[in-house]
Amino acid sequence: MFTAVAFKSNNGGLPVGKQAPSFVLIDTKGIPTKLYDFRGKIVLIDFWASWCKQCRMESPKLVKTYQKYQNMDFEGGSGFEIISIAMDDNLDDWRDAVVQDGYTWTNVSEGKKWDAEIAKDYQVSSLPANYLLDGNGKIIAKDLRGLMLDSYLATIRKK
């Protein structure tokens, strides 16, 4: 069994322990992506934007973490996935940034910047922001970056 942890966050957002709001968003290829399709996995919902310098600086760490943990089993889920949600209004800039930063996981956007419903549903008011979900879609941690994300995943990994 694992415990939920909330790390200090600049983003008030949804509380740890709450069920993550469901969504259907369009990916870089125009295909609808549902949060529900990721049930059973540990999922990082990563809010970012192509214009966010701090987000882009975080990209190499996120790529390494994904490569390290994507096929591992965890308490509360099998496998690790990332759904990156871009808070961009220019979809070409968003798609270019996905390629430039080497994001091989699911990337979605409403193309409405801060007017996006997903930003309201997840109470995101600053970037970068993220939520870590268990296999049932419950928020188990939030705003984990770099070594904090890696360390948290290591603690919930099945040994």
Description of each model-found segment:
Residues 39-40, 47-68:
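Conserved redox-active cysteine motifs that mediate thiol-disulfide chemistry
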Residues 127, 132-159:
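Thiol-/selenol-based redox modules, centered on thioredoxin-like
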Residues 46, 81-86:
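Short beta-strand segments
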Residues 72-79:
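Intrinsically disordered, low-complexity Ser/Thr- and acidic-rich flexible linkers and loops
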Residues 2-36, 158:
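N-terminal "domain-start" segment that seeds a small globular fold
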Residues 26, 83, 95-131, 135:
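Short, internal strand/loop/helix patches
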Residues 42-43, 80, 128:
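Alpha/beta-hydrolase fold active-site loops
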